[in-house]
C-alpha cells in the first residue's frame, strides 16, 4: 500500500486505476461479483463476546464477511484492517503465511475505501480485540476515488448533503440516524396496523382543484399526453377522507409531500408525512393515541421514554400539558380572548406589538395581520410570542384554534368561534396537526368559498375549491378525526439532529455554479 498523504486527488485516482489493472493482471476482477458473505460482523462479535482466546480457538467453523476497509496497519508480511459491513466494524488479520502468496499480492494492492471479502476463524489478539483471522482474502471492489479527510469526516456541511454516499461512510453517527429513521417509520406502521388501520396510496399528481389539504404553495407540472396542468400534492388529507366516505373507517398513508416554500433547518420542500383517519373518533381520542404512539416510539427507537434534543431532556411519558392558542395569543397582545376574536382593539394591539418587536420580519407580519381576520391575527401572535414559551422538558398540545385558521376542521359545539383541533409541539417544533373533521358539506362549501376570496385577495396559500370533495361529503362522512405527523421532524427529535437536512438522505440544495 502506497502512502497517499500529500498527493493530489487526480494523482491518487491515477494510482488506484493502475492498481485495478494490476489486479486484473493477477486474475482478480476489481469490480467482480460472486462473493457472498455468510455472516455479519455483529454476529461474530455477539457470538464470541467476552470469551477468552483459548475458548475461541476451540470454536469450530469459519466466518465469512465482506465490507469496506476503513483503516490499515501494515507490518510487512501481516496487516490489521478495520472493516465495516452494514452491522458493525471488525478487525481482520491478513497474514501472508495464512492467505498465501497470491492473495497477499492482492492485499498489497489494497487502498482505504476498497470493499473486501475475508473468510477464516475468529481469534482474540494479544491486545484482546476480537478479530477475524483471514485464510481467504480478496478485493471485491476497488475504490478508484479516495475518501475525504483520511477518515476524519467531511468538514464541509453542504458537501455532506451533496455526497451523502460519502457522508454515510466517513461521518460518525450518520448511518445510525437513518437506521433510526427507518425504525420510526416501521414502528408507526406496526402501531397503526395493530389498531386496525389500513395502509393506502393516493395520487401525488393533483388537478388544480384537488391541490388542497394544507395552507401551502404547490409545485406545478404538465402532463403532455393529456395536455393537463397538474400540481404535486401538498397533503393527502382530502383523498384519504374520500376513502372514509367510501367505508374505509381507518386509513393511513405514509408518503412524500411537496410544498413550494422556503428552506430552513425545519423545512425542506420535499418531505415525508404520515396522515391517518379514524371514523367515530374525535380529536380528543387522537390526543390519547398520539401520546401512546410517541411514548412507544421513544422506547422502541431510543430505549426509553426520555430523549435528549440539543442538550434538553424531553420526557415523552403521557399525559402531555395543553396550551390554549386563543388565551396565550390574545394575552400576548394585551387583549382578553373574547375581545381579540371580536376584533375589539385588535388593530391597535397589533401595532403596539409590532413596535416593540425586535425581529423586523415578525414586526412586519404583525403589522400585516391587521388586514387578516381576528382569528388569524391571534394565531400569528401565538406563533411569535407563545411558541417560544411552550414547555421545554416535555411535549405539549396546542388547542383552542380560531375557526379562520382551520378550513377543514369541525366547529366546536360549545364555541363555534373555535375548532376541535390540536397541534403537538416538542423541542420547539410542530410535530403533528390533528382535528375532528368537518363533515357538514354546506359548511365545507362556505369555507372553500372563503378560501377562494382569500386567494383572490392575494393569498397564494389559500386552498382551491374542491367541488368533488364537497360532493363526497354530501354522500355522508361519518364523524371522523384525522392527524398528520411530519416524519422528518420526528426523526430530528429521536436522533438529536439540529437540521432537517440531517435526517433526509438527499435534501434539496442549490445547484453549484
Curated annotation (Swiss-Prot):
- NAD keyword on record: no
Q: Which UniProt keywords apply?
A: Aminoacyl-tRNA synthetase, ATP-binding, Cytoplasm, Ligase, Magnesium, Metal-binding, Nucleotide-binding, Protein biosynthesis
Q: Which Gene3D superfamilies match?
A: Bira Bifunctional Protein, Domain 2, Nucleic acid-binding proteins
Q: Which GO terms describe its biological process?
A: lysyl-tRNA aminoacylation
As recorded in UniProt, its EC number(s) are 6.1.1.6
Q: Where in the cell is it found?
A: Cytoplasm
The record's GO CC annotations read: cytosol
Identify the PROSITE patterns for this entry.
AA_TRNA_LIGASE_II (PS50862)
One annotated GO molecular function is: magnesium ion binding
- Name the catalysed reactions: tRNA(Lys) + L-lysine + ATP = L-lysyl-tRNA(Lys) + AMP + diphosphate
Q: Which cofactor does it need?
A: Mg(2+)
- The keyword Ligase is annotated on this UniProt entry: yes
- Residues that bind Mg(2+) 2: 430
Could you tell me what this protein is called?
Lysine--tRNA ligase
Amino acid at each position: 500500500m502506497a502512502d497517499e498523504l500529500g498527493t493530489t486527488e487526480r494523482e491518487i485516482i491515477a494510482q488506484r486505476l493502475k492498481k485495478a489493472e494490476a489486479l486484473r493482471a493477477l486474475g482478480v476482477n476489481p469490480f467482480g461479483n460472486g462473493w457472498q458473505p455468510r455472516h455479519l460482523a455483529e454476529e461474530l462479535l455477539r457470538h464470541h463476546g467476552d470469551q477468552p482466546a483459548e475458548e475461541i480457538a476451540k470454536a469450530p467453523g469459519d466466518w465469512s464477511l465482506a465490507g469496506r476497509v476503513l483503516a490499515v496497519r501494515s507490518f510487512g508480511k501481516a496487516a490489521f484492517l478495520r472493516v465495516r459491513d452494514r452491522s458493525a466494524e471488525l478487525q481482520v488479520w491478513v497474514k501472508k503465511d495464512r492467505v498465501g502468496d497470491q492473495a497477499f499480492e492482492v492485499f498489497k494492492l489494497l487502498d482505504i475505501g476498497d470493499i473486501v471479502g475475508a473468510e477464516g476463524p475468529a481469534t482474540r489478539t494479544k491486545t484482546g480485540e476480537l478479530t477475524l483471522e483471514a485464510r481467504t482474502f480478496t478485493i471485491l471492489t476497488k475504490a478508484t476515488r479516495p475518501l475525504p479527510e483520511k477518515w476524519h469526516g467531511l468538514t464541509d456541511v453542504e458537501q455532506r448533503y451533496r455526497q451523502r454516499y460519502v457522508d454515510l461512510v466517513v461521518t460518525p453517527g450518520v448511518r445510525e440516524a437513518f437506521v433510526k429513521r427507518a425504525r420510526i417509520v416501521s414502528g408507526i406502521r406496526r402501531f397503526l396496523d395493530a389498531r386496525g388501520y389500513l395502509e393506502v396510496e393516493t395520487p401525488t399528481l393533483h388537478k388544480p382543484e384537488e391541490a388542497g389539504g394544507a395552507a401551502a404553495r404547490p409545485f406545478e407540472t404538465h402532463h403532455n399526453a393529456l395536455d393537463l396542468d397538474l400540481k404535486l400534492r401538498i397533503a393527502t388529507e382530502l383523498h384519504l377522507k374520500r376513502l372514509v366516505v367510501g367505508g374505509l373507517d381507518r386509513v393511513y398513508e405514509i408518503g412524500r409531500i411537496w410544498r413550494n416554500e422556503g428552506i430552513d433547518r425545519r423545512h425542506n420542500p420535499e418531505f415525508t408525512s404520515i396522515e391517518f383517519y379514524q371514523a367515530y373518533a374525535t380529536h380528543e381520542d387522537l390526543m390519547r393515541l398520539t401520546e401512546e404512539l410517541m411514548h412507544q416510539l421513544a422506547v422502541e427507537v431510543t430505549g426509553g421514554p426520555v430523549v435528549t434534543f440539543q442538550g434538553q431532556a424531553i420526557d415523552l411519558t403521557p399525559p402531555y400539558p395543553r396550551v390554549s392558542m386563543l388565551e396565550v395569543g390574545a394575552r400576548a397582545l394585551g387583549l382578553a380572548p373574547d375581545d381579540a376574536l371580536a376584533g375589539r382593539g385588535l388593530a391597535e394591539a397589533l401595532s403596539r406589538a409590532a413596535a416593540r418587536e425586535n425581529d423586523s420580519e415578525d414586526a412586519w407580519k404583525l403589522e400585516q395581520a391587521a388586514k387578516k381576520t381576528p382569528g388569524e391575527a391571534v394565531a400569528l401572535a401565538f406563533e411569535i410570542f407563545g411558541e417560544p414559551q411552550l414547555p421545554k422538558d416535555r411535549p405539549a398540545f396546542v388547542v383552542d384554534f380560531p375557526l379562520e385558521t382551520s378550513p377543514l376542521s369541525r366547529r366546536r359545539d360549545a364555541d363555534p368561534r373555535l375548532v376541535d383541533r390540536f397541534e403537538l409541539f416538542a423541542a420547539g417544533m410542530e410535530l403533528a396537526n390533528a382535528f375532528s373533521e368537518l363533515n357538514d358539506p354546506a359548511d365545507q362549501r362556505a369555507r372553500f368559498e372563503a378560501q377562494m376570496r382569500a386567494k383572490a385577495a392575494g393569498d397564494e396559500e389559500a386552498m382551491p375549491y374542491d367541488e368533488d370533495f364537497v360532493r363526497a361529503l354530501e354522500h355522508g362522512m361519518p364523524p371522523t378525526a384525522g392527524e398528520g405527523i411530519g416524519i422528518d421532524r420526528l426523526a430530528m427529535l429521536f436522533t438529536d439532529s439540529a437540521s432537517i437536512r440531517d435526517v433526509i438522505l438527499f435534501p434539496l440544495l442549490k445547484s453549484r455554479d
